[in-house]
C-alpha cells in the first residue's frame, strides 16, 4: 500500500502541466509554428551571456571544487554575493540571513514548514499560483482563499481581516502577481500590514508574510515593487532565478530572513531544519558558483513588453476584456461566455492553449503566459479571433 496523498497527486496533473504536455505533443505532430502555447511560465528570453561564461570558467576549476557537496545552507561566497550586491530596501542583508535553495518549490515549502504546525491556516490571495495549495497542505496546514479586489486585483484587506483566525500563521503575497500581473502598491501593503498587526494583537499570535518574488525585476513603465520587510517586519522573502535570469531548469534561489525580523535566529534555524527534513539541502553546486557572477545581472524585460503590447492591442481590437499587467509575463483575460474551461475546449480546436482559471481560485478567466516568441503572439491573434467567433 502506498501513501494515498502522494498517489493522488501523482495521478493528477496541474492544469498548467497538462496543457504544456499537450502542447509539446502537438508541436511534434503539426510543427511548433502552428501551436500557440500560452500555458507555462517558461521564459523565452535567453539567459544572459555571463551565465555561459561563468559555467565555462567553473568547468576549468578542479572537479571536486565544482561538483562536491556544499554546506547545506549554500556556500558562503554565493550568499555573501547576494547579500552585498542586491538591493534589499532600506536594510542591508548579511550572508547569514540567506539560505540558498533548489528553486521555487523548495523556497516556499521550506518557509511554510518552518512556520506552520498541523491545523494552522495559511491565507492565499486569489487568484493564486495553484501549487501554493499543494505545498500548504503538505505542511498539514489549511489553505484559506481570500479573493482580491475584483476590479483592481489589489489585496482586499478587509476580506483578509475577516478571514484571519487564531489559527492563521501566514499570508502568502506574490507581487508582481502570477497569474494577474498586478503589482501591489505601497498603500495597499501598508494597509495589509496594519490589519496583520491588529489581528496579531487581537489573537495574541505572530502572523507572517511569505513574500514570493520571482517576478520582482519584470515590471513595466514606472511600476514600483515595494520591499515588504520595510513595511512589515515579520516577512520572509522567497526568490529564485527561474524568471529574472531565465534559468527555470537550474533550480537555484534563496530564502531571506531579514535581520529586522524579531525572531530572526529562531526562524533561520527553523528554515534550515525544514530544508533538512524535506530533503532540500545543498542547492545545485555549479549554479551556486554561477550565482556569484550573475547576482546583479539586469533582467531583459523588453521582449516581454513587446509581447504584452501586441497581445493587449490585438485582443482589444477583437473585443476581449483583460486586466492590464504591470509586471510578470501573464495576461489575465476574461473568458468569453464566462466558462473558462468551455472556452479553452473550443480554443484547443484552433491550437490556442491558454490556461483556465479554475485552479487559480478565481473562475471565469484565462491565464495567458506571454513569455513566448513575439511571432507566436502575432500569429495567435487569428486563433483568438476564431475561438471568440466559435463561442458566440
Located regions from the model:
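N-terminal small-domain helix-loop-helix segment of the aminotransferase-like
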Residues: 2-103, 110, 287, 294-301, ...
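Alpha-helix termini
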Residues: 25-31, 89-90, 195-206, 259-265, ...
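Short beta-strand
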Residues: 35-37, 321-326, 358-359
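Conserved core of the PLP fold type I
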Residues: 63-204, 216-231, 236, 382-385
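PLP-dependent enzyme catalytic core of the Aspartate aminotransferase-like
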Residues: 92, 161, 296, 342-355, ...
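Conserved core segment of the aminotransferase class I/II
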Residues: 233-305, 309
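Conserved glycine-rich beta-strand-loop-beta hairpin in the small C-terminal domain of fold type I
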Residues: 285-292, 304-316, 322-334
Amino acid at each position: 500500500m502506498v501513501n494515498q496523498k502522494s498517489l493522488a497527486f501523482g495521478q493528477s496533473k496541474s492544469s498548467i502541466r497538462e496543457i504544456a504536455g499537450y502542447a509539446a505533443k502537438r508541436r511534434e505532430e503539426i510543427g511548433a509554428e502552428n501551436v500557440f502555447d500560452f500555458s507555462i511560465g517558461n521564459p523565452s528570453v535567453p539567459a544572459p551571456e555571463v551565465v555561459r561564461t561563468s559555467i565555462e570558467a567553473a568547468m576549468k576549476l578542479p572537479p571536486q571544487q565544482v561538483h562536491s557537496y556544499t554546506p547545506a545552507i549554500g556556500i558562503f561566497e554565493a550568499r555573501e554575493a547576494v547579500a552585498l550586491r542586491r538591493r534589499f530596501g532600506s536594510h542591508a542583508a548579511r550572508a547569514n540571513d540567506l539560505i540558498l535553495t533548489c528553486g521555487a518549490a523548495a523556497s516556499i515549502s521550506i518557509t511554510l514548514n518552518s512556520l506552520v504546525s498541523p491545523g494552522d491556516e495559511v491565507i492565499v490571495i486569489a487568484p493564486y499560483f495553484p501549487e501554493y495549495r499543494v505545498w500548504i497542505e503538505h505542511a498539514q496546514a489549511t489553505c484559506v482563499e481570500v479573493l482580491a479586489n475584483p476590479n483592481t486585483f489589489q489585496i482586499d484587506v478587509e476580506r483578509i481581516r475577516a478571514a484571519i483566525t487564531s489559527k492563521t500563521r501566514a499570508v502568502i503575497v506574490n507581487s508582481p502577481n502570477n497569474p494577474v500581473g498586478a503589482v501591489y502598491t505601497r498603500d495597499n501593503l501598508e494597509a495589509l500590514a496594519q490589519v496583520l498587526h491588529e489581528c496579531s494583537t487581537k489573537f495574541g499570535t505572530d502572523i507572517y508574510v511569505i513574500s514570493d518574488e520571482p517576478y520582482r525585476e519584470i515590471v513595466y513603465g514606472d511600476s514600483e515593487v515595494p520591499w515588504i520587510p520595510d513595511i512589515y517586519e515579520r516577512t520572509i522573502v522567497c526568490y529564485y532565478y527561474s524568471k529574472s535570469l531565465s534559468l527555470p531548469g537550474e533550480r537555484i534561489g534563496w530564502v531571506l530572513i531579514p535581520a529586522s525580523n524579531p525572531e530572526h535566529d529562531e526562524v533561520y534555524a527553523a528554515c534550515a531544519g525544514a530544508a533538512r527534513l524535506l530533503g532540500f539541502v545543498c542547492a545545485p553546486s555549479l549554479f551556486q558558483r554561477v550565482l556569484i557572477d550573475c547576482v546583479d545581472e539586469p533582467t531583459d524585460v523588453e521582449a516581454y513588453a513587446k509581447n504584452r503590447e501586441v497581445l493587449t492591442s490585438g485582443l482589444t481590437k477583437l473585443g476581449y476584456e483583460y486586466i492590464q499587467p504591470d509586471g510578470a509575463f501573464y495576461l489575465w483575460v476574461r473568458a468569453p461566455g464566462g466558462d473558462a474551461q468551455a472556452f479553452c475546449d473550443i480554443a484547443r480546436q484552433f491550437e490556442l492553449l491558454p490556461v483556465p482559471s479554475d485552479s487559480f481560485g478565481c473562475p471565469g478567466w484565462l491565464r495567458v503566459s506571454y513569455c513566448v516568441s513575439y511571432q507566436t503572439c502575432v500569429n495567435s491573434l487569428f486563433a483568438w479571433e476564431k475561438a471568440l467567433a466559435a463561442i458566440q
